[in-house]
């Protein structure tokens, strides 16, 4: 069963201020597509600013893969309104293009049509594009066009002061990092609840499989859709955004030094497979290096410990310097039922679940047990809505029905919700518990259940196109609420100035720059 956290919940009820001041941020990816759903072949619109230097509007792997990043926010409503304002602004400046509302791409005829994201002529800009060239040559470009939502979350210092007795962030960084690793271990053990409730990629276009072998028993529709009847998130499966070669890196989440050492080892360990790709052929770079990971960001994980980096600092060096500052949840598919790809209910659920993960005991986890937890995730990802589906506890030694585990978890989450709602006029968090709990009695009410029903009727391509057009009209017609047009235009212009400044400050050629990285 789930850990008994009754004592921790009683503690929380006595210390409600410990969770006042949670900080959050959202990153949302979305492909630019044409009116008929084809991948846009135009460059990143200049009017949106520099993809290299804009704080809120950038690109991910491909030139057509937009990424929107909110600032850190303590207010859920303000956070989501800011994100929606970015969407409104972009929607008005895409011409006849629109934003694809699903995680899985559809109308991509050939990987050759996927242009890598471009960041200008500076060394740092060329480095970013070359890293993406490496990803393309290692994993294929199509996999990299899969979109998701990342949720950044940090507990206030008051939580760690009350719970762990730390004085301040600097002197308490060891205890705070240990607390976040406890959260992460619980996330690996129980985070499958996220794709169960919010997975929204139960189907793919047949073009996505072109030339790839799979043992998955797909069912077909006449319109060329492939689906698994009980799947929740094919994006998180081996078909999607994962990397099998990373499963034996031995990265664990028990303490900071061991985690960082394993990560640093991975970026220094040569890979025979990637050595065959080569670094440079006929004067053209193919990847940054031939190691298992080109850089630390290449590590695919459903959750990451993070700290804001300083100039020239790697993510792991930042962690060693100051400890874990926040965590990044990476298991959310694009929510197709929201114009911004994520909803208030999801944000509030994640707050509740991540607080639960921080409160619950989490025994240390070996690399073997980490692989064991993957079995539960895979079961939920591929057939989570199957009647009577179970998850394994204690490395598969006990099997329990998902519905049973989910309801036990939600009994705890409701008590956390009552504490959070005590600060508000409305019982928002408790309402989310009521809304989502239904999904354990009726799996067809989950995102994947609702979406697959729709897709079987209309085809996944049609669903994507119809939603894209609906959201384009909706967003481009809405007034801005927390940002102004002047702010957005000024930020875009400032980003171009910053890019030009970065380009003018380069003092060495790209070959020499690469050698210093």
UniProtKB/Swiss-Prot annotation:
Keyword entries, A-Z: ATP-binding, Glutathione biosynthesis, Ligase, Nucleotide-binding
Pfam name, any one: Glu_cys_ligase
Ligase keyword on record: yes
Pathway entry: Sulfur metabolism; glutathione biosynthesis; glutathione from L-cysteine and L-glutamate: step 1/2
Gene Ontology cellular-component annotations: cytosol
UniProt record, GO biological process: glutathione biosynthetic process
Catalytic activity: L-cysteine + L-glutamate + ATP = gamma-L-glutamyl-L-cysteine + ADP + phosphate + H(+)
Enzyme class, first EC level, given as a word: ligase
EC number annotated for this UniProt entry: 6.3.2.2
GO molecular function: ATP binding; glutamate-cysteine ligase activity; metal ion binding
Protein family: Belongs to the glutamate--cysteine ligase type 1 family. Type 1 subfamily.
Name the UniProt record assigns to this protein: Glutamate--cysteine ligase
Organism placement in taxonomy: Bacteria, Pseudomonadati, Pseudomonadota, Gammaproteobacteria, Enterobacterales
